[in-house]
């Protein structure tokens, strides 16, 4: 075993799995945002060349994997397993994307935390010796998510100021034993935190306590503090959730000066009218695999704490008046193996 258990939640990888290659695919709005130049491909329309939005999302996830394989000089046969998921019922974005690749597949659901969850699982599989190369990937699509979780698009419902825009995007990260980095040195499993928020148009407020809980676990278990990281990035808390998270830490006397959120990075909120920012599995996946890991390889950041969050709701639970459980999984990326 090339890993050490630090607590119930956190493990340290003694021989850190590294990023062999990664790729990000984005929709048209995402491509027009501040990070548009960092994506490997940008779709021309919401159907991504297919007949339905769901098929289009699956195509984006398949394209992300295909591009990552090409960039890494790999074939599908080189990958021992892939961990993938999305927001759709039965994970059809992932399953339909992967059905022609013939790679052993683990379906994962963590809502918008899925990129972090799949990375942690892929790194653990490699450290445990069951895989030499493993892929982690996910996707989301504005139109498919709106139809499943909210209302039909032709209805034209008014969006709340706290609402976030589900990103049309996908990302894939291929990890392996032989890599030039960045490396995943630690992974922290999140636990469900539910503070009773029932407003499904304010998921940032529902997820922020989970991010707070997981980040505290990271600092406690690894003996680090926020200043030990060049950048701390949550996934999709948006403007509302990010403010709540920084306030929770402020009340404990901790400043998150080097903190940002993928939902704030993906769009220009004012010019693109994105209200509280971006969300969706594909938001953090595209930002990580298109922008953050590229920045690490270029030397912009040496140590990065990536902590995507998820709102574990369903239309049924919301209609029944249930509150929204939140989850956050975290992984630590390091530019070199020496930072373990």
Tell me the role of every PLM-derived stretch.
Residues 79, 130-131, 229, 301:
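Short, high-confidence coil segments that cap the C-terminus of an alpha-helix
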Residues 19, 53-112, 228-243, 247:
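Conserved beta-ketoacyl condensing-enzyme motif
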Residues 57-73, 119-121, 206-221, 287-292:
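Short, well-ordered amphipathic alpha-helical segments that serve as non-catalytic structural scaffolds
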Residues 1-54, 152-216, 221-224, 256-273, ...:
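Condensing-enzyme catalytic core mediating Claisen C-C bond formation in acyl metabolism
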Residues 85-90, 112-113, 138-144, 190-192, ...:
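Acidic, glycine-rich active-site loops and adjacent beta-strand->loop/helix elements
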Residues 233-253, 257-292:
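Internal helical hairpin/lid segments
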Residues 109-137, 175, 279-300:
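Active-site-proximal alpha-helical scaffold in enzymes
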Residues 30-32, 93-95, 145-150, 243-245, ...:
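Short acidic, glycine/serine/threonine-rich loops at helix termini
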């Amino acid at each position: 075993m090339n890993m050490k258990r630090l607590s119930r939640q956190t493990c340290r990888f003694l021989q850190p799995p590294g990023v062999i290659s990664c790729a990000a695919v984005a929709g048209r709005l995402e491509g027009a945002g501040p990070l548009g130049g960092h994506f490997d491909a940008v779709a021309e329309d919401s159907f991504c060349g297919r007949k339905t939005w769901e098929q289009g999302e699956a195509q984006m996830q398949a394209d992300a994997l295909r591009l990552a394989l090409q960039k890494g000089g790999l074939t599908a046969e080189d990958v021992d397993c892939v961990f993938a998921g999305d927001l759709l019922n039965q994970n059809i974005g992932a399953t339909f994307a992967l059905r022609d690749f013939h790679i052993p597949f683990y379906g994962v659901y963590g809502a918008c935390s899925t990129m972090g969850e799949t990375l942690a699982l892929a790194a653990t599989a490699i450290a445990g010796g069951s895989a030499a190369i493993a892929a982690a990937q996910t996707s989301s699509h504005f139109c498919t998510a709106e139809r499943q979780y909210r209302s039909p698009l032709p209805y034209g419902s008014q969006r709340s100021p706290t609402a976030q825009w589900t990103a049309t995007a996908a990302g894939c990260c291929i990890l392996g034993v032989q890599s030039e980095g960045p490396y995943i040195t630690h992974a922290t499993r999140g636990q469900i935190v539910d503070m009773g928020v029932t407003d499904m148009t304010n998921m940032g407020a529902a997820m922020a306590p989970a991010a707070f809980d997981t980040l505290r676990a990271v600092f406690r278990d690894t003996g680090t503090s926020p200043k030990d990281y060049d950048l701390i990035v949550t996934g999709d808390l948006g403007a509302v959730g990010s403010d709540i998270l920084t306030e929770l830490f402020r009340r404990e006397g901790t400043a998150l000066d080097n903190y940002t959120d993928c939902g704030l990075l993906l769009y220009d909120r004012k010019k693109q009218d994105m209200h509280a920012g971006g969300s969706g599995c594909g938001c953090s996946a595209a930002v990580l695999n298109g922008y953050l890991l590229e920045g690490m390889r270029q030397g912009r950041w040496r140590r990065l704490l990536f902590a995507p969050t998820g709102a574990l709701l369903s239309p049924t639970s919301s209609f029944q008046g249930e509150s929204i459980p939140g989850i956050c999984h975290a992984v630590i990326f390091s530019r070199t193996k020496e930072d373990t």
